[in-house]
Amino acid sequence: MFTREAIRHCRQCGASVAYRLPDDGDTKERAICTACHTVHYENPLNVVGTVPHWGEQVLLCKRNIEPRKGKWTLPAGFMELGESTSEGAARETTEEAGAQFVMEDLLTVMSVPRVGQVHLYYRARLTSDVFDPGHETMEARLFTEAEIPWDELAFRTVKETLEHYFADRRAGQFGTHAFDIA
């Protein structure tokens, strides 16, 4: 099971916290402030991105940052506070690929408990095949399914998402696929 570094101080008042069962009947130990009694919940992080497509091709980005620097990925990253999942996916696509696109429907939702994350990918119809990648991307390039460097993909979530995208495309109907990644 994934665990982050333990919370040591209350975000509300700065006092120390103790891990214990809350008094409200919760069955999981939580970080509880010893002074103001604020309960601090530790939740998964959301990773949001897109499958940008142009005709028969999808857009992949070669990572210029760790982890997996030099590997290919879909444009994606951590969701920011104050944005919806689709807004975050659009922002990441703009930042990483410099692409022009129209957001479409949700394609995959993947729980990745071993790293404390949930990954959500939307389809995005490209409106141009000209890209201006940001500093996190070495190269942004279009690939057909046959051209994708499957052994050079950065993350299993990217591979699974691309497999669902192309299977749905062949079937002529897109759905939303929700599953766990062990």
Where are the regions that the model predicts?
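Acidic, metal-coordinating catalytic segment for phosphate/diphosphate chemistry
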Residues: 2-50
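Conserved Nudix-box catalytic region and its N-terminal flanking loop in Nudix hydrolases
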Residues: 53-95
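Unchanged
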Residues: 79-102, 106-164, 168, 173-174, ...
